[in-house]
Design a protein with these regions (language model features):
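Mid-to-C-terminal alpha-helical segments outside catalytic/metal-binding sites
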Residues: 88, 99-100, 105-111, 117-172
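Catalytic pocket-lining loop regions of alpha/beta-barrel enzymes
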Residues: 1-111, 169-171
């Protein structure tokens, strides 16, 4: 009715065995995706759009596992079953991790995201840059210009159509 997407983002963990940003967030992102694979949410709500942060947790790294599990569960291919409705953001603090996200997940399903106060606030001694400088990772990924523009702007306008309408009214 409101045409507003939802972001699946957890809060802190009270269990000291689960570090909030190093384990709990990434576990929850991965768990959310698996629940979408197991279920049929988008059959009932075909226009619902969900954003999973942090590059989807372990999703890109284990894409083959999720494809196989979908098959074992008798679900359609992931591209049909979830990717028309699920998007991943680029809050991944490592160039090879960001590159894997772009290699595995279709560009149309990736939204640029930056941090205000990131999970890691330090400078990476290997690169000399802040770990959470997500723009630098996107620009260094070697994407064609049209794919980079999609990730940095156009996909967000698709996922957030009310924002697109507002920006168009402002001539942007």
């Amino acid at each position: 009715e409101y045409d507003i997407p939802a972001m699946i983002h957890v809060s802190t963990s009270v269990n000291p065995a689960f570090h909030t940003t190093g384990a709990h967030y990434l576990n929850a992102d991965t768990t959310a995706f698996m629940q979408l694979v197991q279920g049929d949410l988008f059959t009932d709500f075909p226009t619902l759009r969900l954003v999973i942060p942090h590059g989807g947790g372990a999703v890109p790294y284990h894409w083959g596992r999720f494809r196989g599990l979908a098959m074992a569960l008798g679900k359609p291919p992931l591209e049909q079953h979830v990717l028309d409705n699920v998007y991943f953001d680029t809050c991944v603090y490592h160039q090879p991790g960001t590159d894997l996200l772009y290699e595995v997940i279709p560009t149309r399903n990736i939204l640029f995201a930056s941090e205000m106060i990131g999970a890691v606030r330090d400078i990476d001694p290997c690169t000399g840059h802040h770990f959470d400088d997500t723009r630098r990772y996107a620009e260094a990924a070697g994407l064609p210009a049209h794919d980079l523009a999609a990730v940095q702007e156009h996909n967000a306008r698709t996922v957030y159509p009310r924002l697109d309408t507002l920006l168009k009214r402002q001539g942007r």
